[in-house]
């Protein structure tokens, strides 16, 4: 943004030498003249209030007055517009009147005294008006805030509030009394007008603050220069505004990559944690391109609106919604930056701490920060849109408790859905098991989640039930679907043959192209820069779903067999492919068993008879 401001300043300085030649083309506005017009309208309004027949016209004059006040407010900061008060002449007149008052203060001529007193007060409030505008112009710049305008306005409103009203004795003549009353009426009307305008400026500081340097450079001069170049004779001002707006839009969009790169470079210098990792620097830069580019696009549209409405301010509703979008974009940018640099910073702190530092605390800190960013952004948007945030928070008390009791189950399911979304326990399309429910997640709503069971039945499960029970998510696996089997061999197998069989099975699995091994880990297969630091907080293999364990051991002397445990993981997690890999492994194991002349055991029993009774056979008997 500063780069754009400097560009506009350079353009202004480049065109400034020609300004003196064409200065006469645009007449400066007399602000004091606008004040007098507002004062006259107030006088008409006060007169019509006393006449019921003219009361219907008051709204028309109020509209005209409000338009003048808005126009005046937008011109207060423009130094090309004259204040219209000769302050030197004003001070000289004050000195003259003060001298006359000092001589007549003990005199009996009350009429002359009050006339001079009212004249002096009128000069004093004119001086206050001049000092106010001069203070605004000398103190407010492109980097000023609303509170600066409010503070200046409060100080001068306090000075205007110190002026008193007067009462006149009844022994004055009718002519003198009428003249004093007329002077007092003019004085009171002017005092009220000045107070009204200053209060408006205090309550609408945005209309005074310069926007995008429009007030700092001469917009009239720039637009006139553009209209001179364009070959249009009619509507040249409107066309000039469009051309200037489109130029700024193209400039901002063209500079987005440069601004993003400068922002990333600045953050690198601040945190000093990315100096040895250029790849992470590039990835973080990519992550902030979208929010920065959208921000610049919105900013350019905001500038274009200011140009279109110049010299008046943009409509309040437009400014309100644009401000809300700014807050959302800022939250988006902060989250993107924190994901890139914040996680790395916190992780770096954890790795430098003692071994007693709990890694769970880091995870909690990260989640709390994300939640706080979301809450702050939400409250900021609500406040920008005009909601009373304090009242909203207070309404969550007794009234919120009554509503919560009435719709307890609905709220329980709603907040359970929020918890499930924040926890990211599952996504649509995942295969999950929760209690007696098993199937594929079809859709997660605010109240219930629909699941398609494997028998093709559609199940509707309340979110509170899912949030309150353990969830087994079979789809959160990247590499590794378990293959576990017991290979039973006969007891007639020799020890050496069993050892060679176990060794060959293990070598076969280690060399199998579809069985996971040590090379199939998360850090060697995932290129996302965020996990480079996250590995010091949690196990990346378990976090992303990588399993590569492989065990082959003689495991058990069973009733009818000597069992060999085979425990490994296929690289694929797809069921059909997993079945193919498992089949291939089983066939290869059969070949190894046959190679070592071993036999698969099967459940059997051997009966041993220790003795039989003697049986004598008669002669001629057949057995």
Curated annotation (Swiss-Prot):
Name it: Uncharacterized MscS family protein HP_0415
Instruction: Establish whether keyword Membrane is in the entry.
Output: yes
- Its family? Belongs to the MscS (TC 1.A.23) family.
TM ranges are: 242-262, 288-308, 318-338, 361-381, 387-407
Subcellular localization, as worded in the UniProt entry = Cell membrane
At the top level of its lineage, which domain of life is listed? Bacteria
> Its Gene Ontology biological processes?
transmembrane transport
InterPro entries attached to this UniProt entry:
LSM_dom_sf, MS_channel_1st, MS_channel_C, MscS_beta-dom_sf, MscS_channel_2nd, MscS_channel_C_sf, MscS_channel_CS, MscS_channel_TM-2
Extract the Pfam families matched here. Answer: MS_channel_1st (PF21088), MS_channel_2nd (PF00924), MS_channel_3rd (PF21082)
> Which topology term describes how it sits in the membrane?
Multi-pass membrane protein
Gene Ontology CC: plasma membrane
What organism does this protein naturally occur in? Helicobacter pylori (strain ATCC 700392 / 26695) (Campylobacter pylori)
Keywords assigned by UniProt? Cell membrane, Membrane, Transmembrane, Transmembrane helix
Q: Which Cys pairs are S-S linked?
A: none
């Amino acid at each position: 943004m500063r780069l754009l401001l400097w560009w506009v300043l350079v353009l202004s300085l480049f065109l400034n030498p020609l300004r003196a030649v064409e200065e006469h083309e645009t007449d400066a506005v007399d602000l004091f003249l606008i004040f007098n017009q507002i004062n006259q309208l107030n006088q008409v309004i006060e007169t019509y209030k006393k006449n019921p027949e003219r009361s219907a016209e008051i709204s028309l004059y109020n509209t005209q007055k409000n338009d003048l006040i808005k126009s005046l407010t937008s011109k207060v900061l423009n130094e090309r517009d004259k204040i219209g008060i000769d302050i030197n002449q004003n001070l000289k007149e004050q000195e003259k009147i003060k001298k006359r008052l000092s001589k007549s203060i003990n005199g009996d001529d009350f009429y002359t005294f009050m006339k001079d007193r009212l004249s002096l007060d009128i000069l004093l409030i004119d001086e206050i008006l001049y000092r106010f505008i001069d203070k605004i112009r000398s103190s407010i710049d492109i980097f000023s805030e609303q509170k600066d305008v409010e503070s200046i306005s409060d100080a001068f409103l306090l000075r205007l509030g110190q002026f008193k009203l007067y009462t006149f004795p009844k022994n004055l003549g009718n002519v003198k009394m009428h003249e004093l009353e007329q002077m007092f009426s003019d004085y009171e009307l002017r005092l009220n007008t000045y107070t009204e305008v200053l209060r408006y400026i205090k309550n609408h500081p945005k209309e005074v603050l310069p926007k995008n340097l429009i007030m700092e450079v001469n917009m009239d001069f720039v637009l006139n220069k553009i209209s001179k170049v364009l070959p249009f004779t009619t509507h040249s001002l409107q066309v000039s505004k469009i051309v200037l707006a489109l130029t700024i839009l193209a400039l901002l969009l063209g500079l987005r990559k440069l601004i993003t790169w400068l922002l990333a470079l600045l953050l690198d210098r601040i945190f000093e944690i990315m100096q040895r990792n250029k790849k992470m620097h590039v990835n973080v830069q990519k992550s902030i391109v979208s929010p920065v580019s959208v921000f610049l696009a919105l900013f350019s549209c905001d500038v274009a609106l200011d140009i279109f409405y110049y010299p008046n301010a943009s409509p309040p509703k437009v400014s309100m919604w644009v401000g809300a979008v700014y807050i959302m974009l800022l939250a988006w940018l902060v989250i993107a930056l924190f994901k890139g640099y914040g996680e790395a910073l916190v992780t770096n702190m954890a790795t430098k701490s003692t071994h007693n530092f709990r890694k769970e605390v880091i995870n909690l800190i990260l989640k709390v920060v994300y939640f706080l960013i979301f809450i702050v952004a939400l409250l900021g948007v609500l406040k920008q849109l005009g909601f009373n945030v304090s009242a909203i928070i207070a309404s969550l008390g007794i009234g919120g408790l009554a509503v919560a009791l009435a719709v307890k189950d609905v709220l329980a399911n709603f907040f359970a859905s929020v918890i499930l979304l924040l926890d990211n326990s599952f996504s649509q399309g995942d295969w999950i098991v929760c209690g007696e429910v098993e199937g594929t997640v079809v859709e997660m709503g605010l109240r219930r989640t629909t699941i398609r069971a494997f028998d093709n039945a559609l199940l509707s499960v309340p979110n509170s039930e899912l949030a309150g029970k353990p969830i087994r998510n079979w789809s959160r696996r990247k590499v590794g679907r378990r293959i576990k089997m017991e290979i039973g061999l006969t007891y007639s197998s020799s020890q050496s043959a069993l050892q060679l069989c176990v060794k060959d099975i293990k070598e076969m699995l280690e060399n199998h192209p579809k069985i996971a091994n040590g090379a199939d880990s998360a850090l060697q297969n995932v290129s996302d820069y965020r996990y480079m630091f996250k590995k010091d907080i949690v196990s990346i293999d378990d976090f992303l779903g990588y399993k590569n364990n492989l065990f082959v051991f003689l495991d058990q002397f069973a009733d009818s067999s000597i069992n060999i445990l085979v425990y490994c993981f296929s690289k694929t997690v797809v069921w059909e492919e997993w079945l193919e890999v498992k089949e291939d492994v089983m066939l290869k194991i059969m070949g190894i068993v046959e190679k070592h002349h071993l036999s698969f055991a099967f459940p059997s029993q051997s009966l041993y008879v220790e003795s039989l009774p003697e049986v004598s056979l008669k002669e001629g008997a057949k057995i």
